[in-house]
């Protein structure tokens, strides 16, 4: 299965059969190389990936400055140290799950809820971890 298939079928999927889906998603290597992304995913800046990776290594690193992705600033909210970073901006937000080799990104806007975004992103992330990826 290609990485694009994971994005198209497992991240940009219909959530809970409600006809809702994430606003954007991607699978990105720890080095910032994009493995696959939805057409709506923002253009990443190298320093944004560097900051995200540092927060996984040193939880709380992004809290004072916020999480920046594609030039958009998200307020960092509760996550799981070394595993998940979550951010909020207005009525939407972001979930980033770290696997052995990749970062799985999900960006949502209402009516999708933070919990739905977390579920979609973390489910794929956990699967990739189980596959040694």
UniProtKB/Swiss-Prot annotation:
Any single Pfam family the record assigns to this protein = Profilin
Keywords, alphabetical: Actin-binding, Allergen, Cytoplasm, Cytoskeleton, Disulfide bond, Phosphoprotein
| Coiled-coil segments | none
Localization recorded for this chain is: Cytoplasm, Cytoskeleton
Reproduce the UniProt comment on modification after translation. Phosphorylated by MAP kinases.
The Phosphothreonine modification is found at 113
| UniProt motif Involved in PIP2 interaction: location | 83-99
Q: Which GO terms describe its cellular component?
A: cell cortex; cytoskeleton
GO MF entries: actin monomer binding
Q: Which domain of life is it from?
A: Eukaryota
Residue pairs linked by disulfide bridges in the UniProt entry: 13-117
Q: InterPro entries recorded for this chain?
A: PFN, PFN_euk, PFN_sf, Profilin_CS
Which family does the similarity line name? Answer: Belongs to the profilin family.
Q: Kindly state the subunit structure of this protein.
A: Occurs in many kinds of cells as a complex with monomeric actin in a 1:1 ratio.
Additional information: The variability of the residues taking part of IgE-binding epitopes might be responsible of the difference in cross-reactivity among olive pollen cultivars, and between distantly related pollen species, leading to a variable range of allergy reactions among atopic patients.
| Role according to the record | Binds to actin and affects the structure of the cytoskeleton. At high concentrations, profilin prevents the polymerization of actin, whereas it enhances it at low concentrations.
Q: What is this protein called?
A: Profilin-4
